[in-house]
Amino acid sequence: MEEKKVDLKDTLNLPRTEFPMKANLPQREPQILEKWKGLYEKIQKERKGREVFVLHDGPPYANGHIHVGHALNKILKDVINKYNLLIGKNVNFIPGWDCHGLPIERAVEKELSKKKIKKESLPKTEFRELCREYAKKYVNIQREDFVRLGVLGDWEHPYLTMDPKYEAQEIRELGKFFERGLAYRSKKPVYWCIYDKTAEAEAEVEYYEKEDPSIYVKFPLKSGEKFGIKDKKVFAIIWTTTPWTLPANLGIMVKEDADYVLVEVEDEVWIVAKELMDKFFETVNRPEGLVLETVKGKDLVGLEYTHPFVEKEKLKGHLSEETLKNMWKIYPSEFVSLDTGTGLVHMAPGHGQEDYVVGQRYGLEPYAPVSDEGRFVEPAPEFLINVRVFDANHLIVGVLKEKGFLVHEEKIRHSYPHCWRCKNPVIFRATPQWFIGMDIEFFGKTLRQRALEEIEKVKWIPEYGKNRIKSMVENRPDWCISRQRFWGVPITVFYCENCGEIIKDREVFERVAQLVENSEKGSDVWFELTSSQLLPEGYKCPKCGGDSFTKEEDILDVWFDSGCSHAAVIRPLGFQKADLYLEGSDQHRGWFQASLLESVGSYLEAPYKAVLTHGFIVDEKGRKMSKSLGNVISPQEVVKEFGADILRLWVVSEDYTEDVKLGKNLLKKIADDYRKIRNTLRFIIGNLYDFNPRTNALPFEKLHHFDRWIISELQNLLKKVHENYEKFLFYRVHNHIKNFVITTLSAIYLDVLKDRLYVYAPASWERRSAQTALWHLLIALTTSTAPYLSFTAEELWEHVGKLDPSLPESVFLYEMPKPDENLKDEEVLKDYEILLKVRDEVMRALEVARKEKGIIKHPYEAKVYIRGDESVESLLKKYEDYLNFFFTVSQVELREGGEVQIEGEELPVKVGVNKAEGEKCPRCWIYYQKEEFVGCVCKRCAKALSEMGIELNAVC
């Protein structure tokens, strides 16, 4: 019976792995999530006692599904946390949610309106319960979305700003501000939303383009005698884009040291700033009049005028005697600019921050005859009563025109503050509010001074963030912390009904905090219990001894809510401050600033060591994502089509410090990069199926020089990877890894290595050396990509664990290798720097031989001739025995020759190519002379077969 022949192909060590080529991420990732259940807790247990890295999560708002902005933010945080895990630290990451505030109130009101129920008809606590349930619902929805992205954290115990413990700590924090004299109540102008009927913080205001009337108005001076003008009426000319504020005008401001001109215009005299005169007359489309006199701003101070359409008599009984005495005069102000207008600025202390400051200086109260809904009320002129402010503009312009006080009117498009929730324009309106004073001293310094000092101690990434927040803190007004709404933490102060004293004792705050903490529904107790039930038993007013008290009805600004998170979340765990806060760049005026001011006011220090910001997401054309443009991409959609790892790879592929582009074409390109990386990792693990790193790995010094080269290059890569992870430059991490995988590994190392892996006997030195290098590569690449390609790294790790069962069950319980100088061969690195350049020249020559001359079809069909200068030639001689494998050709001779000849472009070498001599070995495909064959295969293959126990006659 004829003996069955062994197929030569079956004698090759071809790759074998169960790690699939097709990722199928959308289907595979949920299986990995199952495996990760309990991983965060296991890490906490195993890493106990290690250095802890604390990234404090800025709480997203518990409303709606997550969008790609949320995904970008949480993935960036996750990459940082996982890198810190992989360098051996313990990581504390407690996700949080912002649960109070107007958007939730609005959403609940909308639901109620469907049932024809008005919010006002429900008890406050019942409405608050509906808000609580709404927030819970979206916390759960968003939590699922974040977990699906592969974000690791304590998802079972997140912090919620509506949690009773959190609210109680917030009340204690508030108490400190009262105790230190930093919190006060005052009537002053604040941003006011007339649609939501509440005050707003600076951070809650967004600027959009708005069209408004731009008008120039004549205010008649009572007399021009100071300038010797008796026979003509003298007018101060003001410019405004908010005509609706004119009913509240109490003064005109000028720049003391600026020049002003008195200009004769027909039978009148107009006063404008000299510097703005030409521009003014051009704008109002009138010929310039005769300048009668030039005076300084200080010469105008004290002059009295009459209001174009408001009668003083009607204000009596509504305004204080002091205001009535000081109103309608010209006052000096440092806020007057000579950039636009006339240099004379209409002042309404009830409708502008700067106007208010000057008004306070000169005894003018913040008068604002406007209701919560933005409608004019008494004592505004009769024609305006019950009219909305923005609707009043054209009525006021009409009256000015009719009375002859309108100089000019046009339309202007300008940037105007809008409510971040309802997107409607807001107004500045003086109402009684609670404030935290930026310039009140405590412990020898003001809150502003301390905050600015702390900013200097924090690391800001990118650096421009420092100047941004610094200028905001330098210029910000006092912090308005009160809101006229239902769903939030109450401002827990009482008023004595007998003497009006504000009760703000520490023991009172502590008593309320304890009641809140011990109630299932937290701060609802404030609305459920009476003052006497909330106050300590037998409490008396410290001023008059009274025992009847009224509760404050306002609630706290949600920025104070989230600004307390360091005190409610980080400090109770024993951490003085977080290592890092990371949010979008809009949070310099939002959470970063609120947290800074709250922490400095409470603990005299910043709550963070470093602050990192990212940009916003735009489409591939750089446009903002919007439903109207149809360019919105949801993370859920990306995960469903591509998988979360593709979204994660997108995050690290971009420079997130700028605005980040996202679109389907970009995602396809990212998916293509992913495939290249995955296939390379698959090839590596596929060639380790018979390798036991514990018993088969060789020491570095005993490795083949080509393997020593790649491991040396790997140390260089690890150095760059660690450096850029530490600097949060993830796009550089990814670029370095991607280039290494695609260029250094796929195109060079692994391509050359195939011969050694496939042809030599499985346990040969040549193959074990190659496998040792592959093992180093596998561990380094799996761990260094794990922070961002988390699902893929974990999937791969399951296969890695089969090769070495002593490894931990998850890649995130292992440590990423650090660059090791003992695994670097500088001589080999230097040699290969030249050899690779020679290889490039050889590849170029082979391409000419294949494409242009048709001499060869495959590189193994080639014989290569190389001639170089002395230094190149001596290097080539050093590695002569390996050159044909390195160039993937059959033969190499160090002399001139060949049918195809090219001159080196980068090196002084000549490369020639001829068809290889001899015959092709059917097993390794390399050409040898007849005498180099044993039977039907070359001597090298014959040796390998012998070591494998395969007799030649079984294959030949």
From Swiss-Prot:
Cofactor note: Binds 1 zinc ion per subunit.
Transmembrane segments: none
Broad class of enzyme this protein falls into: ligase
Subunit and interaction comment: Monomer.
EC numbers: 6.1.1.5
UniProt GO BP: isoleucyl-tRNA aminoacylation
Alphabetical list of PROSITE patterns matching this protein: AA_TRNA_LIGASE_I
Motif 'HIGH' region, chain ranges: 60-70
Keyword Protease included in the entry's annotation: no
Reaction it catalyzes: tRNA(Ile) + L-isoleucine + ATP = L-isoleucyl-tRNA(Ile) + AMP + diphosphate
Chain positions recorded as L-isoleucyl-5'-AMP binding sites: 583
Gene expressing this chain: ileS
Subcellular location: Cytoplasm
Motif placement: 'KMSKS' region: 624-628
Cofactor: Zn(2+)
Source species: Aquifex aeolicus (strain VF5)
Cellular component, GO annotation: cytosol
Protein name: Isoleucine--tRNA ligase
